[in-house]
């Protein structure tokens, strides 16, 4: 029999709302890179009301491969950021959701509302807004009381009666809850 180290499928999420902005600005001779994003992130749950105090212009719901959802709102008014840059901002957010800041685990059940930003007619491009979206999400996530979600499994343990005490002690030392015993 071969044993290997078990990879526990932790997830990360947030417990409160937070706002952040990030300006990506890089100049090196020719055309540079510029993109600025303002966003609010909140814990997401089914049946949640629209974002308070923001004008919603678009909403997309993404079922994440690792479980949970990302709800992405376009709340930009007045053309502060062209709509063509929103997919790049989303890519940056999704990239950061693949590796949360606490354990490097996937992030789930978050609502992101992009509500403002700035662009430059020459220096703004997709990579600038991807980086700005990723960094704004990272900053907001750290301010939003992040938490690690641990998996819960129901297991049935069969053992000889003389080992019952030792096995129960081991399970409880690992925060296991014994729901019943049969002999």
Spans of features found by a protein language model:
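Accessory interaction regions appended to the cores of large information-processing enzymes
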Residues: 1-183
């Amino acid at each position: 029999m071969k044993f290997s180290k078990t990879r526990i499928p932790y997830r990360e999420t947030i417990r409160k709302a937070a706002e952040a902005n990030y300006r990506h600005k890089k100049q090196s001779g020719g055309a540079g890179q510029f993109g600025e994003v303002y966003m609010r992130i909140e814990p997401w749950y089914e049946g949640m009301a629209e974002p308070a105090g923001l004008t919603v212009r678009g909403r997309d719901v993404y079922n994440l491969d690792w479980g949970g959802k990302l709800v992405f709102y376009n709340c930009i008014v007045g053309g502060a950021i062209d709509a063509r840059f929103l997919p790049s901002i989303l890519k940056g957010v999704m990239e950061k959701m693949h590796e949360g800041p606490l354990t490097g685990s996937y992030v789930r059940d978050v609502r992101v509302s992009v509500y403002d930003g700035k662009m430059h007619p020459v220096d703004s491009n997709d990579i600038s807004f991807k980086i700005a979206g990723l960094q704004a999400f990272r900053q907001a996530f750290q301010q939003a009381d992040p938490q690690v979600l641990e998996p819960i499994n129901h297991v049935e343990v069969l053992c000889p009666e003389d080992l019952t005490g030792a096995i129960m002690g081991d399970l409880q030392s690992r925060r296991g809850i014994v729901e019943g015993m049969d002999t």
